[in-house]
């Protein structure tokens, strides 16, 4: 039997079935009962910077890169773009909205589409169909697909947008992940709002491990910093120097200035 209990379980719609833990796979049940489990600890997909975070965060540091991972990844033209890299975190303070039973963030929608256009224009040698956009919320997926209809022909036709579940078991050269969840200081209930299943470690693991060459995360660090798991990614991004403040960015001219220590502290404390 082969499986990964650190990735998404079966989708359960029945509350009764959920109460009986029908979302637990046979693999998990056997593991819990003490059956021997062997970890396949070598990965051939992700670049070293992303795989290190995934390994440390979800596999106790046991996931190792194949010895030829740098040759497998190669040195694509994408890396010649100073705005891109192995891992990029884009901060934006756009507002979340609850529509039709799901969440959306229109500022993130605009930003994601602009990033797709930036990649297409700055790296013409790259097949834009190798760019995928993931969001955990169906409403955000809908809004992203609608917005992409107004993008340039190649971007509109070839960039795939889907939920986390829709991308499990798959990969793209570039993955852009839209976190959606955010808030503003004007919201009197902002301190009582969680980030929902965005904080689920299995969902986070799948979302961030689909990218081969470049992972771009779009989100509000002030909101995400409430989660220990997302705080770890934010701190890791800051340490690597790839955390950018995107508020006010219009696209097509490279990324704006990176966040310095004072700025990131200012953003995190803004809502306290």
What positions do the PLM features span?
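Conserved helicase motor core of SF1/SF2 NTP-dependent helicases
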Residues: 1-272
């Amino acid at each position: 039997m082969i499986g990964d209990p650190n990735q998404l379980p079966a989708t359960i719609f029945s509350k009764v079935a959920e109460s009986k833990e029908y979302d637990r796979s046979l693999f998990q049940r056997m593991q819990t009962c003490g059956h021997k489990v062997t970890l396949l600890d070598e990965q051939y997909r992700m670049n070293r910077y992303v795989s290190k975070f995934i390994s440390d965060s979800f596999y106790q540091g046991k996931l190792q890169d194949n010895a030829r991972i740098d040759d497998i990844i190669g040195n694509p033209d994408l890396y010649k773009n100073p705005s891109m890299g192995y891992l990029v975190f884009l901060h934006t303070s756009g507002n979340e909205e609850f529509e039709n039973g799901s969440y959306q963030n229109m500022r993130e929608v605009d930003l994601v589409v602009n990033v797709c256009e930036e990649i297409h224009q700055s790296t013409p040698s790259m097949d834009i169909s190798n760019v995928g956009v993931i969001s955990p919320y169906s409403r955000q997926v809908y809004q992203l697909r609608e917005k992409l209809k107004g993008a340039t022909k190649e971007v509109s036709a070839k960039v795939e947008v889907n939920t986390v579940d829709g991308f499990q078991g798959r990969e793209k050269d570039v993955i852009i992940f839209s976190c959606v969840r955010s808030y503003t200081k004007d919201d009197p209930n902002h301190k009582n709002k969680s980030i929902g299943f965005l904080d689920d470690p299995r969902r986070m693991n799948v979302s961030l491990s689909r990218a081969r060459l470049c992972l771009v995360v779009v989100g509000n660090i002030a909101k995400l910093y409430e989660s220990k798991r997302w705080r770890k990614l934010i701190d890791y991004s800051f340490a690597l120097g790839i955390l950018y403040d995107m508020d006010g960015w219009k696209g097509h001219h490279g990324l704006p200035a990176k966040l310095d220590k004072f700025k990131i502290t200012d953003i995190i404390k803004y809502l306290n």
